[in-house]
């Protein structure tokens, strides 16, 4: 019986543990007086106003309770200080219960209910008394031992399993009691434990609801409901009648509470006997134990978790990995059991952290603490039913943290202890916050660094695997890289048929084997349509109507091409005019700018001229000096005569050269003058003189030639004296006429020259000194050179 009870409690504890992850289960430590063995009894989920019972035997000293109730913090010495902590929560969707037909576990654990509120712990010292059912559906502890509490668990030595007893809860508080009958010895032990805790409790601290004194053997206990649903159209199931479901857990860190009456709606009925003095003393004692309790929390968590998994493995044969994060347990339950644990698991994880652990010494005797339910909105978890990777860091959103902190602060008596209860969640959240902070710091560093396209694409590919670098290639570059062909080239393309208006990408068959429709024919060029018609006549016999239609189509195509060409020519003409107009506008603008500059310069020059004339008018002496510059040469006769003579001498006397006219070379020699060598003073003056000499020579030569020709004419008119030129016939008889004629001509030419010489120079005209050619000299001195 003990083995079956432990197995059922372990299986039910696992299912309830999935809804209460961080030590939110109820502690039921049933210690048997007879066998001196610590048995981990049943752990059952409860409603919003549920409670748990720790049955400890004082005779066994309960030395092993610290391992099972490690977070209860010295509950063995405070067994009588029973404080009930309740939260008004809502009923959640039940989890299907794991059944085991081999062990006889079945209908007694059909449904497991979880609550968003905290569970309760009750340390009740029990004995080996039996339980009997009352007429009103409740059970009573009797001394006869006719019935056993196993009737509620459907666990008996015979192996018969019955359905759990469903007891409806009425509004009458007297009907909501589950009474136990205890022995005087147990009551005395309870009184001794209360005195050891310095609570100064009188008999009223353990006074039952019927108002009897402390020696009464009856204890009242709230009944844990079992679900019953009533469905309405268009609404979710509503729980109306709670049922009893005793629960126990291998471990729990929950506070003990006195036995009180709780309504079905979750409201609280204050205990009948409340001793304020005892409450104050108890608070002082409890506050002293807070530090020790908080220090032991972290050490006990590992032992509790280990015990949970070992108990689970012994019961079901399977256990999740040793990790307390609610994501792992969530996925584990989803993989191994049917149902949806998200309603009971995730909400319980945070809401049940209030008033859960280390509250045994903080609460008053006979005081009921109620915490209002905190609304908790959990974010949507992506793929919650997939296996969760243990190595992946688990993150809790900040809104969960804020709701958990707000729910923690809702209980005024447990503010110092809830931080230790939420160590696992807060550490997970802190890790998540550290990751977020690290990511934000990395982002700030990346912003400060220069942008790298490769790193950005890699990061984007890691986020979006289907990302393609060429996907966002803008078509603007292709459009901007349009061809810069001239309009004449475009016109040639149109004429050649390369670019067609309305031409599809598919090539049109112009082989003539197939008769094309009107639409296809109109898409052809003039050359293509000519080829098409010629080939079509070769393969087909056309009627007159078809030929007329082809002619019309060909005419349309040509007209279209001509129109396009004319438009293109007109366009080109207009563009050329526009370019010329732009050029003329530019030239006009430049000319205007030059004209403006010239006007400005003219104005400036006029201003300078006006200023000079004004200065000359104002200064007459300056005007006279300025007028001498432009005055001509004086009108003196002497100066003009001397200048004329000098010019004449310079031209005809100083630079005169005798002509080489010699009528008789023996008698008359050319007149020669020996010119002195002139020193070159300046190159400019020498060049001027040289030019004047050349001109005078030409002039003198022209005069001499005219005289020479006139004299020759006069000589030719006078008769020749041929008496001296008779040919001796005796000596020259054998000569011919030709030779005689030549001689006559030669002798006649010599005679003419002699005659001319005689005529040109007569004895009368030539002076006595110059008769001889050898004595012909000039007695005049040489001219001095020009300065």
Curated annotation (Swiss-Prot):
Disulfide bond positions: none
Biased composition, class Basic and acidic residues, residue ranges: 763-778
bZIP domain ranges (all copies): 549-612
Pfam families: bZIP_Maf (PF03131)
Alphabetical UniProt keywords: DNA-binding, Nucleus, Transcription, Transcription regulation
PROSITE patterns: BZIP
GO CC terms: nucleus
SUPFAM superfamilies xref list: Leucine zipper domain
Region of interest: Leucine-zipper: 605-612
GO molecular function: cAMP response element binding; DNA-binding transcription factor activity, RNA polymerase II-specific
Top-level taxon in the UniProt lineage: Eukaryota
Comp. bias (Low complexity): 18-90, 186-223, 235-258, 273-305, 351-366, 473-483
Chain positions covered by the region annotation Disordered: 18-95, 153-173, 186-306, 343-372, 401-441, 473-507, 723-747, 763-787
Keyword Cytoplasm: no
GO biological process: regulation of transcription by RNA polymerase II
Subcellular location: Nucleus
Basic motif: annotated span: 551-603
Function: Probable transcriptional regulator.
Family membership: Belongs to the bZIP family.
Name listed for the protein in its UniProt record: Probable basic-leucine zipper transcription factor J
Organism: Dictyostelium discoideum
């Amino acid at each position: 019986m003990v083995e079956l009870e432990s197995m059922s409690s372990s299986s039910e504890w696992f299912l309830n543990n999935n809804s209460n992850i961080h030590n939110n289960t109820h502690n039921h430590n049933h210690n048997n007086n007879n066998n001196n063995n610590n048995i981990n009894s049943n752990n059952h989920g409860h409603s919003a106003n549920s409670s748990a019972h720790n049955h400890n035997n004082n005779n066994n000293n309960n030395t092993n309770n610290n391992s099972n109730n490690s977070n209860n913090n010295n509950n063995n010495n405070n067994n009588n200080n029973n404080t009930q902590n309740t939260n008004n929560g809502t009923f959640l969707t039940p989890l299907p219960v794991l059944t085991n037909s081999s062990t006889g576990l079945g209908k007694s654990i059909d449904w497991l209910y979880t609550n968003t509120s905290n569970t309760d712990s009750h340390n009740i010292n029990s004995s080996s008394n039996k339980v009997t059912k009352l007429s009103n559906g409740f059970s009573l502890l009797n001394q006869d031992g006719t019935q056993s509490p196993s009737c509620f668990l459907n666990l008996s030595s015979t192996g018969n399993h019955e359905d759990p007893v469903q007891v409806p809860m009425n509004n009458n508080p007297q009907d909501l009691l589950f009474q136990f009958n205890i022995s005087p010895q147990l009551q005395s032990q309870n009184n001794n434990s209360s005195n050891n805790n310095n609570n100064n409790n009188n008999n009223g601290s353990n006074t039952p609801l019927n108002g009897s004194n402390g020696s009464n053997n009856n204890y009242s206990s709230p009944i844990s409901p079992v679900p019953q649903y009533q469905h309405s159209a268009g609404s979710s199931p509503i729980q109306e009648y709670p049922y009893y479901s005793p629960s126990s857990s291998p471990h729990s860190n929950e506070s003990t509470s006195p036995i009180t009456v709780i309504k079905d709606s979750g409201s609280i009925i204050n205990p009948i006997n409340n001793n304020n003095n005892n409450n104050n003393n108890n608070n002082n004692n409890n506050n002293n134990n807070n530090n020790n309790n908080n220090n032991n929390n972290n050490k006990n968590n590992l032992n509790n978790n280990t015990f949970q998994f070992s108990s689970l493995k012994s019961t079901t044969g399977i256990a999740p990995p040793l990790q307390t994060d609610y994501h792992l347990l969530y996925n584990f339950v989803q993989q191994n059991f049917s149902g949806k644990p998200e309603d009971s698991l995730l909400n319980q994880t945070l809401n049940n952290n209030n008033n859960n652990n280390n509250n045994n010494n903080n609460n008053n005797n006979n005081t009921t603490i109620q915490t209002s339910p905190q609304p908790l909105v959990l974010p949507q978890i992506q793929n919650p039913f997939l296996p969760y990777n243990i190595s992946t860091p688990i993150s809790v959103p900040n809104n969960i943290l804020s709701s958990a902190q707000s729910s923690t602060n809702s209980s005024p008596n447990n503010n110092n202890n809830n931080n230790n209860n939420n160590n696992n969640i807060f550490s997970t959240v802190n890790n998540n916050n550290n990751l977020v902070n690290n990511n934000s710091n990395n982002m700030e560093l990346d912003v400060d660094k220069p942008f790298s396209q490769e790193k950005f694409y890699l990061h984007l590919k890691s986020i979006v695997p289907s990302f393609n670098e060429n996907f966002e290639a803008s078509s603007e570059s292709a459009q901007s890289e349009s061809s810069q062909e001239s309009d004449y080239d475009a016109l040639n393309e149109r004429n050649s048929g390369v670019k067609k208006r309305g031409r599809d990408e598919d090539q049109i068959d112009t082989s003539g084997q197939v008769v094309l429709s009107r639409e296809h024919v109109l898409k052809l060029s003039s050359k293509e349509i000519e080829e098409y018609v010629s080939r079509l006549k070769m393969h087909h016999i056309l009627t007159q109507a078809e030929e007329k239609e082809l002619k019309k189509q060909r005419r349309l195509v040509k007209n279209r091409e001509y129109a396009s060409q004319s438009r293109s020519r007109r366009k080109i003409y207009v563009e050329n005019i526009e370019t010329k107009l732009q050029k003329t506008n530019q030239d006009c603008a430049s000319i205007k700018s030059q004209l403006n500059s010239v006007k400005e310069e003219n104005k400036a020059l006029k201003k300078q001229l006006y200023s000079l004339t004004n200065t000359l008018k104002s200064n007459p002496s300056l005007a006279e000096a300025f007028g001498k510059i432009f005055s001509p040469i004086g009108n003196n006769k002497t100066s003009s005569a001397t200048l004329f003579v000098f010019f004449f001498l310079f031209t005809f006397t100083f630079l005169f050269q005798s002509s080489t006219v010699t009528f008789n070379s023996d008698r008359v020699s050319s007149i020669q003058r020996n010119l002195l060598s002139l020193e070159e003073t300046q190159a400019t003056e020498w060049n001027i003189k040289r030019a004047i000499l050349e001109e005078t020579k030409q002039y003198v030569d022209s005069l001499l030639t005219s005289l020479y020709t006139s004299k020759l004419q006069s000589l030719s008119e006078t008769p020749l004296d041929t008496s001296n030129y008779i040919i001796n016939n005796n000596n020259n008889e054998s000569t011919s006429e030709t030779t005689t004629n030549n001689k006559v001509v030669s002798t006649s030419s010599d005679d003419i020259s002699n005659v001319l010489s005689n005529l040109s120079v007569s004895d009368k005209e030539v002076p006595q000194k110059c008769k001889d050619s050898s004595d012909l000299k000039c007695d005049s001195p040489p001219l001095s050179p020009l300065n």
